[in-house]
Amino acid sequence: MDKFNINEKMKRTKIITTIGPSTHSPGAIEELFKTGMTTIRLNFSHGDHAEQGARIVWAREVSAKIGKPISVLLDTKGPEIHWRIKGLLQKSLNIYHQMNNSLMFSPSFCKFLHYHYTLLLSKKTKKQLLKIVKKLKKLQSQHYNLAHGLRETWTSSFCFNERPSIWRLLSSFKQIVTSFKISLVSKVLIKL
């Protein structure tokens, strides 16, 4: 494989495409690259390491063939909180249902507390996005501007305009989670 010039300028804006079963061939990756894709995303929640490794090899082959670099983004399986809806309802939490509606909030400078979770839903609520509001509203009253968006991948981001102490923030979440009797593993991402 040819080596790329390390000093060559790369585009800062990336067009990311998730590679999955429908794009599982070198030809498909090449077609995506020709139509403007700059980065392939590999979701390690689905597929084994050998399958994902083959996709990386294909991307490198296409990259060498065309003569331009293709970035590879690995979306590894992160920590998950498994919410048992029945258990939450027994705790008398207010759960609000909304059909295909979510709040999106993206200021230029903010801190994100980012975590993944899986909702175990009954057939009735499978089509709806759930918002668990009651316990999280306590954070709003503590001078945080809180916005909550649910995405297709069930990834939640909490965005804070102010710059609170991260440890204070995590301890607030720890209290909430302790009241739910659920263990939370989280990571803090700082957006610059």
Swiss-Prot record:
UniProt GO MF annotations: ATP binding; kinase activity; magnesium ion binding; potassium ion binding; pyruvate kinase activity
UniProt catalytic activity: pyruvate + ATP = phosphoenolpyruvate + ADP + H(+)
EC number in record: 2.7.1.40
Pathway(s) annotated for this protein in UniProt: Carbohydrate degradation; glycolysis; pyruvate from D-glyceraldehyde 3-phosphate: step 5/5
The organism's place on the tree of life at top rank: Bacteria
UniProt-annotated binding residues for substrate: R41
EC primary class: transferase
UniProt keyword terms in alphabetical order: ATP-binding, Glycolysis, Kinase, Magnesium, Metal-binding, Nucleotide-binding, Potassium, Pyruvate, Transferase
Ligand binding (K(+)): N43, S45, D75, T76
Pfam family, one: PK
Binding site for ATP: N43, F44, S45, H46
InterPro entries: Pyr_Knase (IPR001697), Pyrv/PenolPyrv_kinase-like_dom (IPR015813), Pyrv_kinase-like_dom_sf (IPR040442), Pyrv_Knase_brl (IPR015793)
Cofactor field: Mg(2+); K(+)
Family membership noted in the UniProt record: Belongs to the pyruvate kinase family.
Protein name, UniProt field: Pyruvate kinase
Organism encoding this protein: Spiroplasma citri
Underlying gene: pyk
